[in-house]
């Protein structure tokens, strides 16, 4: 039966009629599928195919209508007949094709230094193109993010290499001659002449119904964006791919960051969370992350992006009343004029809800909400500082006008967008009584039936209560004090993550009445400790909350410790005196929490690894007096810290001790039971029991003496630990004017398109390079394919003297070599919290791979801890990245602290 255009039009009409009747929610998927078919019917491609079919059946097969039978037939006659037909006869060439579909005359391929070029098109891409997927996501972690133009260390990019593309020969069969588009099956023939024909959605006739994670195709819009590559690249970062999905199992390629001043930002159309479908003519749906990056690298100077994004969401306006509490309003904000939280949007957004604060208790305000007004003060088109001031200048009763996203986001299972403007420092502000800088809110107690932060003292029962704990690897997880003159046994400390903390039933200030029916009301400290030690795995404790008695007891302990400290300092019996050392500055090589040290004789001083301390009184063997040194100068606060001798003695005792609860701590962490001999009768750890044995003394990290030194160069940066490559890439892409990489040396012969001094320093003499390595002129070197490769001290120095941080992808051994060369690097170790933490940041890792990564990190820490400038930890890569940026900024001054030659 011949195909007629009017039949197609009738079918289209019937489909549209049927679609209009599908108004129920359950019909949404069917309606979406019908819309796809309608779009196909209405496309230029489909109409062209109908025209061809009709022309073939009606005109070519019915020769009498257009051919004189008296003339001999010619093989080319059908083509001639088609050319004089009444159909549109505009020639389809690269000039008349829409710009969006015209292929480039030249193709460019990326040639890696030592690996063969990969294929342009992913093996997954066939004629049957799978529909793209897109979910609305927040920028939750940088772990899967690859920057389009960020390259570090030895990953040098060779210049693009043009190769001529061969165009197909004209067709010799009776079909419409069209210029094929690579990786697509597209035929373009307008049914009516158009001066500027619109771009046609490629392969609309073969698109399958996509498996949308959130929403249908009706929820999305499509756009073609043409960018001209600038000096700093395309100016955006991507994440995702089949090998490392950005969100869940969605393998789409997402835009995760728009770099201010880059090509994408100047164009203004590309947005964070856009999904890239094609780069020029390369389909990047359902491809690996590296394939997408390769497509962007090879795209040339003019890059056409076909993107898909979720349609703008409507907002619901509501008013929220909050009553200020001890923690203020209890939320953080970001955004404002000049400090956009989301590119192109000056609004003020809620970025964090602080546990136990007013907003948390009220429950209505959520992350991602937009603040429109506070009381009568409008917060639209205001600066960040103005918004903070308005929120701080409120009374106890605060009325917030907020715009909430509709349920389109609420049903996603992912948080609304929380995107940090890449061009500025993070400036989240907590709206609390005295906080202008962002602080990380305490994580909720996951296993506690009621969050302890929400309950006030008045809400906790004062009656005796029974608590059952199961002893874990950290014992019972609390410390006790008391037991003198029948004053009672009190809980003085709850170990985070221990059985007591996870139960949520015990708290500091509880008096222990009994343990497994053993009455402790009049027990001594030793009797209470023995009862807890011998209680077995399941321990039943009767406790009573007595905060007033505990406060009086604490005051008494404080007075005793003050007397001891004054007596100790006045006796001056220590081996290290301030009279012997005029000024003593040290760098801490461990974290110290004064609340975990029950032996402090006076007010303690908290510090963390890498902090600089000015020891102003080192005359005592056990305790020093010190103040912290910050980038802004010395702190006024003076506190007590454990001496080097005390730290090492306690740590060695811990390493030589067999503990009944197999208690373990991280290397360099101060034991919780650090106490003074004079107070032994009033404090102990409820889960410690020591049986010492003799063993070889271990090297213990405590303090490193340092001197301040002026530098006239920009310090190199070495990042070690899991996900370091992602962090390095992001630093270079976000701050191309502040970070760079040095040119390595190699004995490999130069290739035709390479430039000496740009791609590599090509060394003609292997013997000379080996000699330079022996003379320590290289911070790191190795051999690959019988060629030497290495990074020289001079190459690093050249980058440093240009005012850029040289990003180095090297081992920990390079830190010491740079220090010897008087190039003191900023060395940062990313310490994973656990195997699960690693797998969360890189979802494609197997459990075995995560275990090996974790073990490598622990070995790295053990081997190079004393050489690290700082150690960072975080739940997400975004947290870690922000910490790294802050550390680099703090360490970038003209005066730095370097290891001193003298020893403690």
UniProtKB/Swiss-Prot annotation:
* Guanylate kinase-like domain: residues covered: 714-889
Phosphothreonine PTM positions read: 115
**Taking every annotated instance into account, which residue ranges of this chain make up the domain PDZ?**
224-310, 319-405, 466-546
**PROSITE patterns named in the record:** GUANYLATE_KINASE_1 (PS00856), GUANYLATE_KINASE_2 (PS50052), L27 (PS51022), PDZ (PS50106), SH3 (PS50002)
Q: In its UniProt record, which GO terms are filed under biological process?
A: actin filament organization; actin filament polymerization; amyloid precursor protein metabolic process; astral microtubule organization; bicellular tight junction assembly; branching involved in ureteric bud morphogenesis; cell-cell adhesion; chemical synaptic transmission
Membrane topology for this entry? Answer: Peripheral membrane protein
Q: Which SUPFAM superfamilies match?
A: L27 domain (SSF101288), P-loop containing nucleoside triphosphate hydrolases (SSF52540), PDZ domain-like (SSF50156), SH3-domain (SSF50044)
Name the SMART domains for this protein: GuKc (SM00072), L27 (SM00569), MAGUK_N_PEST (SM01277), PDZ (SM00228), SH3 (SM00326)
Positions of region (Disordered)? 662-693
**Domain L27, residue spans:** 4-64
Subunit-level organization = Homotetramer. Interacts (via guanylate kinase-like domain) with DLGAP1, DLGAP2, DLGAP3, DLGAP4 and MAP1A. Interacts (via guanylate kinase-like domain) with KIF13B. May interact with HTR2A. Interacts (via PDZ domains) with GRIA1. Interacts (via PDZ domains) with GRIN2A. Interacts (via PDZ domains) with KCND2 and KCND3. Interacts (via PDZ domains) with KCNA1, KCNA2, KCNA3 and KCNA4. Interacts (via PDZ domains) with ADGRA3. Interacts with KCNF1. Interacts with CAMK2. Interacts with cytoskeleton-associated protein EPB41. Interacts with cytoskeleton-associated protein EZR.
Protein name in UniProt: Disks large homolog 1
- Species for this entry: Homo sapiens
What is this protein's gene name?
A: DLG1
């Amino acid at each position: 039966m011949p195909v007629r255009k009017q039949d197609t039009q009738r079918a289209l009409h019937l489909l549209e009629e049927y679609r209009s009747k599908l108004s129920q929610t359950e019909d949404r998927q069917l309606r979406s599928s019908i819309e796809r078919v309608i779009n196909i019917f209405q496309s230029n491609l489909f109409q062209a195919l109908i025209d061809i079919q009709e022309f073939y059946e009606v005109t070519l097969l019915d020769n009498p209508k257009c051919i004189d039978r008296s003339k001999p037939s010619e093989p080319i006659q059908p083509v001639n007949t088609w050319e004089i037909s009444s159909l549109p006869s505009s020639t389809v060439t690269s000039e008349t094709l829409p710009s969006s579909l015209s292929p480039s005359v030249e193709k460019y391929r990326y040639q890696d230094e030592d690996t063969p070029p990969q294929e342009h098109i992913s093996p997954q891409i066939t004629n049957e193109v799978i529909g793209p997927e897109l979910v609305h996501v927040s920028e939750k972690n940088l772990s899967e993010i690859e920057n389009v133009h960020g390259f570090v260390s030895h990953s040098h990019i060779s210049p693009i290499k043009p190769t001529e593309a061969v165009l197909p020969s004209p067709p010799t069969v009776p079909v419409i001659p069209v210029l094929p588009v690579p990786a697509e099956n597209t035929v373009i023939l307008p049914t009516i002449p158009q001066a500027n024909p619109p771009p046609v959605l490629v392969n609309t006739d073969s698109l399958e119904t996509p498996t949308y994670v959130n929403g249908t195709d009706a929820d999305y819009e499509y756009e073609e964006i043409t960018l001209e590559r600038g000096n700093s690249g395309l100016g955006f970062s991507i994440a995702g791919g089949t090998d490392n999905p950005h969100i869940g199992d969605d393998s789409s390629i997402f835009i995760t960051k728009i770099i201010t001043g880059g090509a994408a930002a100047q164009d203004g159309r590309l947005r964070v969370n856009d999904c890239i479908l094609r780069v020029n003519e390369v389909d990047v749906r359902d491809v690996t992350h590296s394939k997408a990056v390769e497509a962007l690298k090879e795209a040339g100077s003019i890059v056409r992006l076909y993107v898909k994004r979720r349609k703008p969401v409507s907002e619901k306006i509501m008013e929220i009343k909050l009553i200020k509490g001890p923690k203020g309003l209890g939320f953080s904000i970001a955004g404002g004029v000049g400090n956009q939280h989301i590119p192109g949007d000056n609004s003020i957004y809620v970025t964090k809800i602080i546990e136990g604060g007013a907003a948390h208790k009220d429950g209505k305000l959520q992350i991602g909400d937009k603040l429109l007004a506070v009381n009568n003060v409008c917060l639209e088109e205001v600066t960040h500082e103005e918004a903070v001031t308005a929120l701080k200048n409120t009374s106890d009763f605060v009325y917030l006008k907020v715009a909430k996203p509709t349920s389109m986001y609420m049903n996603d299972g992912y948080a609304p967008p929380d995107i940090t403007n890449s061009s500025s420092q993070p400036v989240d502000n907590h709206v609390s009584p005295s906080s202008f800088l962002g602080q990380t809110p305490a994580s909720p107690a996951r296993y506690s039936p009621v969050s302890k932060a929400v309950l006030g003292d008045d809400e906790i029962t004062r009656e005796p209560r029974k608590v059952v704990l199961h002893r874990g690897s950290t014992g019972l997880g609390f410390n006790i004090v008391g037991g003198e003159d029948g004053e009672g046994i009190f809980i003085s400390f709850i170990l985070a993550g221990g059985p007591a903390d996870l139960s949520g039933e015990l708290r500091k200030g509880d008096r222990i009445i009994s343990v497994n029916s053993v009455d402790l009301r009049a027990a001594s400290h030793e009797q209470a400790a023995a009862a807890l030690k011998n209680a077995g795995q399941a321990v039943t404790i009767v406790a009573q909350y007595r905060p007033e008695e505990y406060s009086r007891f604490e005051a008494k302990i404080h007075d005793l410790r003050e007397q001891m400290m004054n007596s100790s300092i006045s006796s001056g019996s220590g081996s290290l005196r301030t009279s012997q050392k005029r000024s003593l500055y040290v760098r801490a090589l461990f974290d110290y929490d004064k609340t975990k040290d029950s032996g402090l004789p006076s007010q303690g001083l908290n510090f963390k690894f890498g902090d600089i301390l000015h020891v102003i009184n080192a005359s005592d063997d056990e305790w020093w007096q010190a103040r912290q040194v910050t980038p802004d100068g010395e702190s006024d606060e003076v506190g007590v810290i454990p001496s080097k001798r005390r730290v090492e003695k306690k740590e060695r005792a811990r390493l030589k001790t067999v503990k009944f609860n197999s208690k373990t701590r991280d290397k360099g962490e101060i034991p919780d039971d650090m106490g003074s001999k004079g107070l032994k009768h009033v404090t102990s750890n409820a889960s410690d029991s020591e049986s010492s044995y003799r063993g070889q003394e271990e090297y213990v990290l405590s303090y490193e003496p340092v001197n301040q030194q002026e530098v006239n160069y920009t310090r190199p940066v070495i990042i070690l630990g899991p996900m370091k490559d992602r962090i390095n890439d992001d630093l270079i892409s976000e701050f191309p004017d502040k970070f760079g990489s040095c040119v390595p040396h190699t004995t490999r012969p130069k290739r035709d398109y390479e430039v000496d001094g740009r791609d590599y320093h090509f060394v003609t003499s292997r013997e000379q390079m080996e000699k330079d390595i022996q003379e320590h002129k290289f911070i790191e070197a190795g051999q690959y394919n019988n060629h030497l490769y290495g990074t020289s001290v001079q190459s690093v120095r050249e980058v440093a003297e240009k005012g850029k941080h040289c990003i180095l992808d090297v081992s920990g051994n390079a830190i010491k070599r740079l220090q010897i060369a008087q190039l003191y690097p900023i060395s940062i170790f990313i310490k994973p919290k656990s195997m699960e933490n690693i797998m969360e940041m890189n979802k494609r890792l197997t459990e075995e791979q995560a275990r090996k990564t974790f073990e490598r990190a622990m070995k790295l820490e053990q081997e190079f801890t004393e050489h690290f400038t700082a150690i960072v930890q975080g739940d997400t890569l975004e947290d870690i990245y922000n910490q790294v940026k802050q550390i680099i900024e703090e360490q970038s001054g003209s005066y730095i602290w370097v290891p001193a030659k003298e020893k403690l």
